Amino acid sequence: MSQCNSSYSVTRENLKYFAQFVYLVPGVLFQLRILIVIWGTHNKIYLKSSFFTIWSLDSLVSLVQMFLDVSFTRIHIYFPQLCEGFSVFLEIHWMIPNIVYPFYLYAFTAKSVIHSFLSINRASCVLMPTKYAYIWRSHMKKVIVFILLYPFLLLWNVIISEKYLDFIFGGFVISYIKRVPWASLSKFQIISYVFTFSVTLVTNSITLSKMAKLKKRLLMAERHLCVATAWISSGFVISLIAQAHFAFFRGDHELVEIFYIIQCVSFDLLNVGSPIVMITLSRELRNHVFLINPSPVVSRSTSTFNNKNNISILIQ
């Protein structure tokens, strides 16, 4: 039996979706373009860099999550007129939520471990400049495998548990009934986010401290690193707040709706904001993505990734 809330204004809820559509669709196309550059047209440049190899995985999971948001997840939240029919459809075709929901969570869960490795990567660049490339090249396959498998350590209970429709706003979200009561995804996420946040702060503090001691201080690189750190950290802190509510204080339905919004803000901040920050701060990537003077940039980029004295990996 449908539990759709008909008290919500169809027009207002639809406008909420289209307001997000305005930046999510360009975000999807933007991430797709970045992946084409890194994995396709300029793969000989970027895949030589352990940093961009790892960061491209972040672009991939962001692309997946934003695509699902704009084509599925936020449609059944912000289109009250579709709620009844869509909810019945998903209850009949139960395999759809059983596949889409874990897949969506997989994408965002992977981001925390990816950003941990990115922070460690940047720190090792300045701490071990002569060994940096060799160490990461030697262990890159292991790092990628770990990143791909890590989300399952958090999501296994979601995968095996029964899914149901949780009606919020004028629509609904997909949730799950824990088959293993103690294995809460929100609690797992809190641990993961706290770890990522801690690693980001510690490694970037070490990186900035080391850079400040260089004979020729790279003030612009230091400033860029601070901006990137602040942006990424704010995204995980906001998500941490939402997960803390879901893990320990979930009860008041109105508050649940507020924290769903907070969670979406954190998703969008990381998924849409991260590539914008990188494009803004990395001249080489910006030139390749927007086809600005590509020829001269190729030679500079190649030397960038092989010159131990160049700190461009920290964001130029």
From Swiss-Prot:
Positions of disulphide bridges: none
TM spans (from-to): 21-41, 50-70, 99-121, 140-160, 188-208, 229-249, 258-278
One cellular component term from this protein's GO annotations in UniProt: membrane
Keyword Transmembrane: yes
Main location group: membrane
Membrane association type: Multi-pass membrane protein
A single BP term in Gene Ontology: sensory perception of chemical stimulus
Gene Ontology molecular function terms on file: transmembrane signaling receptor activity
Subcellular location(s) of the protein: Membrane
Keyword annotations: Membrane, Transmembrane, Transmembrane helix
Pfam families: Srg
The family this protein is said to belong to: Belongs to the nematode receptor-like protein srg family.
UniProt cross-references to PANTHER family, sorted A to Z: SERPENTINE RECEPTOR CLASS GAMMA-1-RELATED, SERPENTINE RECEPTOR CLASS GAMMA-RELATED
Name assigned to this protein: Serpentine receptor class gamma-4
Organism: Caenorhabditis elegans
Gene, per the UniProt record: srg-4
